[in-house]
A protein has these predicted regions:
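Short glycine-rich, low-complexity segments
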Residues: 1-33, 54-72
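Beta-strand secondary-structure signal
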Residues: 20-22, 37, 49
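Short beta-strand-centered aromatic/proline hotspots
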Residues: 34-41
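Basic/aromatic-rich interaction segments and small domains that mediate binding to polyanionic partners
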Residues: 41-60
Length: 72
């Protein structure tokens, strides 16, 4: 079952544990779609920086992106 990351402590734990998380944004139909997944490299109250599988880096705003990790 997915766990949504909301608080700074959630992102801190994900970064320390090097857990892959998914970044989801609303599509035109109003459904959440995955736009990226990766490891949290840096975060602030405004944005999260993810390092993807291929090594590229992307930034996502926390106010319009939902972040989830899957519980195993």
């Amino acid at each position: 079952m997915p766990h949504t990351l909301n608080k700074n402590i959630d992102f801190f734990i994900a970064a320390l544990s090097q857990t892959y998380i998914s970044a989801l944004q609303l599509d035109p139909d109003g459904m959440y779609a995955e736009v990226a997944s990766g490891i949290v490299e840096q975060f602030s109250d405004e944005q999260v920086r993810l390092r993807r599988y291929d090594g590229s880096v992307s930034h996502y705003a926390r106010d319009n992106t939902k972040f989830q990790r899957n519980k195993g």
